[in-house]
């Protein structure tokens, strides 16, 4: 597992990460208010540029805010140059970004979830977003839009909803490059404000945070628990195939 750390200072709380190049064990410290997002950087839907730039803008003068970007693409080159370019454009900032690249052992991944306060999604469209659901199931509130499939489990009780609006788009496999579909454009200001609001909640409103965390877990339980999925599948099979149970 490789990691790239931008800004920030070490503290007592840490996550152990193995550096693949020399097999040495390094400490990646995660303290203060921690945000996490997991995505393939080559997937244009994920809109991670807004995640990074809104974070650095919202917390330009905040030293104890950390954004963890867990990259799922096999190639380090899939994001490193682009991420570095964003930093050049942003100028100086006191907040911290940690980019993780490579496989994480289960224990390391669980520590990352435990250290996280909010999971961040700024996608233009989603088919499900399993990492978001996983973090919410572990009582981590979301900063995310309420569109496409996320509309099934994102609401204001379990996170901070980012505003979005429809815009035309070209399907990835469209040879003629015509606008044949729609997606959602994220409201950047809304995302930046959600960062600021979430930070204030963690720092000054612990009871509000606990309620959001509990609601996040409950939302996923109502949407995708084994009992719920089993019942939905049973209804579908009975209706469409005439199966009896």
Region locations from a protein language model:
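Conserved donor-binding/catalytic core segment of Leloir-type glycosyltransferases
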Residues: 24-46, 52-55, 67-69
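Short hydrophobic beta-strand element within catalytic cores of glycosyltransferases
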Residues: 141-144, 160-162
């Amino acid at each position: 597992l490789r990691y790239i750390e931008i800004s920030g200072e070490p503290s007592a709380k840490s996550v152990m990460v193995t550096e693949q190049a020399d097999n040495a064990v390094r400490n990646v410290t995660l303290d203060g208010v921690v945000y996490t997002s997991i995505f393939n950087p080559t997937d244009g839907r994920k809109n991670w540029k807004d995640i990074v730039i809104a974070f650095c803008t919202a917390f330009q003068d905040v030293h104890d805010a950390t954004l963890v970007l867990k990259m799922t693409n096999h190639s380090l080159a899939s994001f490193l140059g682009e991420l570095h370019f964003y930093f050049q454009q942003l100028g100086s900032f006191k907040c911290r970004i940690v980019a993780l690249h490579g496989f994480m052992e289960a224990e390391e991944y669980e520590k990352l979830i435990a250290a996280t306060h909010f999971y961040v999604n700024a996608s233009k469209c989603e088919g499900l977003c399993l990492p978001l659901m996983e973090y919410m199931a572990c009582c981590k509130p979301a900063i995310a839009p309420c569109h496409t499939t996320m509309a099934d489990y994102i609401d204001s009780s379990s996170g901070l909803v980012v505003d979005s609006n429809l815009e035309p788009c070209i399907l990835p496999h469209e040879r003629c490059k015509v606008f044949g579909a729609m997606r959602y454009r994220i409201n950047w200001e809304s995302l930046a404000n959600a960062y600021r609001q979430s930070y204030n909640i963690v720092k000054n409103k612990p009871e509000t945070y606990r309620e959001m965390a509990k609601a996040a877990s409950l939302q996923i339980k109502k949407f995708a628990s084994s009992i719920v999925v089993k019942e939905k599948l049973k209804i579908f099979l009975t209706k469409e195939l005439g199966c009896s149970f």
